[in-house]
């Protein structure tokens, strides 16, 4: 008989683009989500948790982001039933597509308007990169079925409260708002400027290839171009709005082929931000006031800032800013973005603004795919991992978890005594554990306490047991003394205390309090 | 040109076996997980969050549960790279398999022993049934690398603390412990009883088909049989340990073919529970004392109960119970199970014990698949959804979320005033919202407040605005009055109050406090 082949051992590795989170990384995120949920709830939003798996049919197979139509999902086919092939299922790629499905499925049971929040992992089947993972958290709040801009204003206020709830101080952030309708006004105005649009041969072909009307294709280029303001700068944007642009490699990107007058209008929109919100509104009215939709957009921005001011969310926090272009292609009305204004050092030691941590806006096609009915919606997504990184960069998050008090095992036969000690400490609310490894080598036990970042070790050998005392070692102080052994003032401070067994909890609590570690 | 076919609208439905969770269902589970995490943390366990996706290779393709080898996972193949086929990925089916992968992958960076907790969704590709979903939560704590039964004892204590932390009172639960080693002792003892095991023809064939030694096959039947004690009762188990058993349909199940003396030993083990833990230990020693492994198992049980007593986890909460058989086939040492002892009414109105809500035990092959090295581990899994159901059955959970205070919109042009009111309420920590639907029909606004389960509605029309007052409607009291309109005492109690605008927050807070709804 042939010897059966030995199966090779499996590799102990996460799939590419996935990672594990340990200790404080997990609990800090959990706490942040809980605080944000608290704010969302206070604003009247109800929790919704849908599952990670949806039918591909309900989800739509690809992300809506026009620039990356190939960004995919993780999908698989269910086993076939007796008479029909299995459904295709997929992991959700965001929390908005499931919201659309939920709203269409349960709409008779949901309040109208429906304010809901959702937080949880989403999955993207894309090439992983540095700091770019294929599973990450989203933390969204959306109002479905409210066409009033009061809904948008409310979400901007909520965004401010969320940032403050997680530890971003007032003055360290700003919520910038813009409106797709103003941009539509800009497009109307430039349309009126060029009765007979100048179209290059290339542009005509492209529009035909896309099966779009020429104006639609042109609008697409304008939208994509202004979305690149950050990356290309003003001159780059001007070139792309005009005949086109050569990049560093010499490759030519064809432009929207607008006239100079048209380009001037677009640029004046992007640069319309004044010293105050009122000034910005005046500038915008000047640019798009002739367009009905444009004027409506400016009116909405004015209304939003007025509603927010009434709730004391003033211009120190809410800024109308036409240069907020991200998402203008996707959204249909107001858009908003929270930006942290403080500077941080990036990985390469360069100082830069931290930038955007949340964004959202109004979109009106939420459930249309399912029901044919247009339902207005507006919502925000907070980038929890970005926010954690920001707090970390500001030194407001201690990423090392405080370890447990470690009760060492001097005498294996008296494990019950040591268990009694940890039980007392835990019942007093103190994080504590008995050493559960092989107790033979005492040095290993202290090394373990060090690995665990323990503040205190408890020692009770035979002598102590007989005398009815325990030794309590202040490991934080001990480490400080070890670091600065030359300093006389440290040398004289004892870091180990002998106390009666009955005073164990009190003494440990005292030491924790000295280090600011009490609960 | 042929008219393009209209794409049919997608169905707005969860995939079969998945469901959505709304409002209080979500927040109550989140709160429960947070409380359990608090206890786990206090016991020195560190959080671990791995992703939902693992390689099939790392995960192992199927569940370890011997009785259901076809219980599957959701799996798919990654897109191929240029030169090699894509990896197979899958959704995790529990939190233990990922722990094994994490421990093998990161072992040099982890403390030893490693106490970790994990909570999150897992997925099973099985036929859904009533109340049986293909995504559900697990909430685990495991200690890896500690061979001492002190680790098992600690987890039993922690289980008690978790139950009390989520609202199960002392006296309403018991943690029952048993030990696989005692069962191994039983098997040794019965092996010694039958020098020449009596084997039916069928039994011999089966053992050969399974490619196992006859004794191994026999042990398998004994294990599976005692695991069916709950379902078959003592007589059923006796039959299956002996020649076999005819079920109601007349089908014969072949048995383990043990002699009467052997069966008596197994049954005496299952019925060894005495009035106290000490009595049980004496009974067990009598049955398996002659077997080395059996004696070791009884010693361990004694040690565990001694360690727990030292931490004041006494016999009112910790019960040695040989009839705990679930998992004895899978685990290698101590096993434990938390059972709620109170009675509830089931769906059909029958009274029954609520039963098990958590279980676990010791298993030693955690990372062996990856490293070849045997690492001892012990851990528990708390059934969060079962626990929520238990609290609900006891009336300790209110599943209706308290709705927000609703500020109604009497005058669409004064939205800023209404926004100012909700801002004040929210800043005072009160859940509140302004009505964001079409305000034309005031009745709809009150209906909305009703749908939202709102405790209070705020009304400010033109008259009130001029007078500088607001109307505050106590909706809870209003509903009570409406229900019992014949009672004179109710009739005279007003449920609507006019207060100065400046007293809005104070009055709302007062009403909430009257209904026990203050924060």
UniProtKB/Swiss-Prot annotation, chains A, B:
It holds the Pfam family HGTP_anticodon. Its EC number is 6.1.1.21. GO terms for molecular function: ATP binding; histidine-tRNA ligase activity. Transmembrane segments: none annotated. It catalyses: tRNA(His) + L-histidine + ATP = L-histidyl-tRNA(His) + AMP + diphosphate + H(+). It comes from the Bacteria. The keyword Magnesium does not apply. InterPro entries: aa-tRNA-synth_II, aa-tRNA-synth_II/BPL/LPL, Anticodon-bd, Anticodon-bd_dom_sf, His-tRNA-ligase, HisRS-like_core, HisRS/HisZ, HisRS_anticodon. Keywords: Aminoacyl-tRNA synthetase, ATP-binding, Cytoplasm, Ligase, Nucleotide-binding, Protein biosynthesis. GO terms for biological process: histidyl-tRNA aminoacylation. GO terms for cellular component: cytoplasm. It is found in: Cytoplasm. Its main location: cytoplasm. NCBIfam families: hisS. Belongs to the class-II aminoacyl-tRNA synthetase family. HAMAP family: His_tRNA_synth. Homodimer. This is Histidine--tRNA ligase. It comes from Roseobacter denitrificans (strain ATCC 33942 / OCh 114) (Erythrobacter sp. (strain OCh 114)). The lineage of its organism: Bacteria, Pseudomonadati, Pseudomonadota, Alphaproteobacteria, Rhodobacterales.
């Amino acid at each position: 008989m042939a010897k059966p082949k030995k199966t090779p051992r499996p590799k102990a590795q996460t799939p590419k683009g996935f990672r594990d989170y340990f200790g404080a990384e997990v609990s800090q995120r959990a706490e942040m989500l809980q605080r944000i949920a608290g704010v969302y709830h206070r604003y009247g939003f109800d929790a919704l948790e849908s599952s990670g798996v949806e039918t591909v049919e309900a989800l739509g197979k690809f992300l809506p982001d026009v620039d990356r139509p190939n960004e995919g999902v993780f999908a698989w086919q269910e086993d076939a039933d007796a008479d029909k092939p299995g459904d295709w299922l997929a992991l959700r790629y965001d929390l908005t597509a499931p919201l659309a499905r939920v709203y269409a499925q349960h709409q008779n049971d949901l309040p109208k308007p429906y304010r809901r929040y959702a937080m949880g992992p989403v999955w993207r089947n894309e090439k992983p990169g540095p700091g770019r993972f294929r599973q990450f958290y989203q933390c969204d709040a959306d109002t479905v079925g409210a066409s009033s801009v009061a809904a948008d204003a409310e979400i901007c206020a909520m965004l401010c409260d969320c940032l403050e709830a997680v530890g971003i101080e007032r003055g360290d952030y700003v919520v910038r708002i813009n409106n797709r309708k103003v941009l539509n006004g800009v497009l109307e105005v430039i349309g009126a400027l060029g009765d007979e649009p100048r179209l290059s041969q290339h542009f005509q072909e492209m529009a035909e290839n896309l099966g779009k009307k020429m104006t639609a294709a042109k609008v697409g280029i304008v939208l994509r171009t202004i979305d690149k303001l950050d990356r290309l700068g003003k001159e780059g944007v001007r070139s792309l709005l005009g005949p086109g642009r050569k990049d560093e490699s010499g490759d030519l990107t064809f432009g929207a082929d607008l006239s100079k007058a048209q380009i001037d209008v677009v640029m004046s929109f992007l640069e319309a931000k004044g010293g105050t919100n009122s000034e910005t509104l005046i500038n915008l009215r000047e640019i798009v006031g002739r367009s009905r939709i444009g004027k409506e957009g400016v009116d909405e921005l004015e209304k939003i800032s007025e509603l927010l001011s009434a709730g004391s969310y003033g211009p120190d926090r809410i800024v109308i800013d036409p240069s907020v272009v991200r998402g203008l292609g996707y959204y249909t009305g107001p858009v908003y973005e929270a930006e942290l204004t403080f500077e941080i050092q990036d990985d390469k030691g360069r100082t830069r603004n931290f930038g955007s941590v949340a964004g959202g806006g109004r979109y009106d096609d939420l459930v249309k795919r399912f029901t044919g009915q247009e339902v207005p919606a507006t919502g925000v997504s907070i980038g929890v991992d970005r926010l954690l990184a920001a707090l970390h960069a500001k030194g407001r998050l201690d990423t090392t978890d405080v370890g447990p008090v470690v009760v060492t095992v001097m005498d294996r036969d008296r494990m019950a005594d040591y268990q009694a000690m940890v039980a007392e400490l835990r019942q007093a609310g103190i994080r504590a554990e008995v050493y559960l490894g092989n107790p033979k080598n005492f040095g290993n036990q202290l090394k373990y306490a060090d690995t665990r970042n323990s503040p205190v070790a408890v020692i009770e050998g035979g002598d102590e047991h007989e005398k009815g005392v325990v030794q309590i070692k202040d490991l934080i102080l001990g480490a400080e003394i070890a670091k600065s052994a030359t300093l006389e003032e440290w040398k004289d401070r004892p870091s180990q205390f002998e106390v009666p067994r009955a005073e164990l909890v009190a003494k440990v609590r005292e030491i924790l309090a000295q280090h600011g570690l009490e609960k």
